């Protein structure tokens, strides 16, 4: 009987023909060999599934399937159910990993009792140039700096025993899944390794949909879901409150840039009303030692926005910032 793979690498695929080979090759060329690839074509309209079938013909550790489009959340959940490995990793089809990636994560998680080990990542462009990197420290805040399900390894038993799955909320499934994971175990560790290459694809959903506030994402619904995730006795509630502050600021600045000033102010009021009503106001300063490893540019944006609010210049800021 063939020995089961140690790691199942789940790759959701949708219209990824331009970069799919790079992604798969980066997995096949790993120094660590005990793995399987579960590549699920999510109703692609290009040659993605044809490419997957070509790989499957010569690589016995690749499993592929294709069906109608159901979204990334459904596809990842399907991958978890199909996984034969003791450990699970996710890779997006336009990203790629360094040759020692699986080995590093396997060595980290197999040597202890961790339910998940989280690494950093680097943002790269078409030419492979690093735009920036997110290198994690050992502090508790580090795992909140990146909420992607990628650049980390999970113990499958932990996911199954806790019935952890991705919710069907487009553009928020990663955030909600990761925050739920964080509340289910104290055995989650961060490492400074950055072997995941997060490709800046100008044509991807995350870079094309966010031109103005996305009408398909109800920010209050997402915030309600976050609040529902947090146990009453959760020791990291203050970190999640700070995360909400960071997340909502990103939502306002990203969506507000190409929106009207009136819509920006409406969204701002809606978010801050929710934070006040639900007792989610963060008391952590951007200078607090607990978040010392956060990127400087993130801290600067949060500090500047706080100052604008305090001196009563929000309306002027919206008028100058918003281009809608």
Whereabouts are the PLM-identified features?
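Catalytic core of nucleotide-sugar-dependent glycosyltransferases
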Residues: 195-202, 208-237, 242, 246-279
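Nucleotide-sugar donor-binding/catalytic module of glycosyltransferases
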Residues: 1-219, 231-232
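Membrane-interface aromatic/basic loop that binds lipid-linked glycans or pyrophosphate carriers
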Residues: 259-324
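Polar/charged side chains located within well-ordered beta-strands of beta-rich proteins
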Residues: 152, 245-246, 309, 317
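A short, terminal or domain-edge coil/loop segment
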Residues: 169-177, 225-228, 246-255, 284-304
């Amino acid at each position: 009987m063939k020995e089961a793979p140690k790691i199942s690498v789940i790759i959701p695929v949708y219209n990824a023909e331009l970069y799919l080979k790079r992604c798969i090759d980066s997995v096949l060329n790993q120094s660590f060999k005990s793995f399987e690839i579960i590549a699920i074509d999510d109703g692609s309209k290009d040659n993605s599934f044809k490419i997957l079938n070509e790989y499957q013909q010569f690589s016995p550790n690749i499993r592929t399937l294709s069906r109608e489009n159901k979204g990334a959340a459904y596809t990842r959940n399907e991958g978890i159910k199909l996984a034969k490995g003791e450990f699970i990793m996710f890779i997006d089809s336009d990203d790629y990993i360094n040759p020692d990636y699986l080995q590093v994560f396997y060595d980290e998680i197999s040597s202890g009792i961790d339910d998940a080990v989280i690494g950093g990542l680097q943002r790269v462009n078409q030419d492979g140039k690093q735009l920036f990197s997110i290198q994690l420290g050992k502090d508790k805040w580090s795992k909140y700096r990146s909420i992607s399900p990628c650049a980390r390894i999970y113990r499958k038993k932990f996911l199954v025993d806790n019935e952890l799955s991705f919710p069907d909320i487009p553009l928020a499934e990663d955030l909600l899944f990761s925050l739920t994971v964080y509340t289910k175990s104290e055995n989650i560790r961060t490492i400074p390794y950055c072997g995941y290459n997060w490709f800046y694809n100008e044509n991807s959903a995350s870079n094309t949909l966010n031109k103005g506030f996305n009408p398909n994402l109800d920010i209050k619904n997402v915030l309600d879901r976050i609040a529902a995730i947090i146990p009453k006795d959760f020791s990291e509630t203050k970190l999640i409150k700070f995360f909400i502050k960071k997340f909502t600021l990103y939502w306002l600045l990203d969506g507000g840039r190409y929106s009207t000033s009136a819509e920006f102010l409406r969204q701002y009021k809606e978010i801050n009303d929710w934070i006040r009503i639900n007792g989610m106001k963060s008391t952590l300063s951007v200078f607090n030692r607990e978040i010392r490893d956060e990127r400087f540019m993130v801290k600067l944006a949060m500090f500047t926005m706080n100052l604008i609010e305090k001196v009563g210049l929000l309306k002027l800021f919206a008028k100058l910032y918003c281009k809608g």
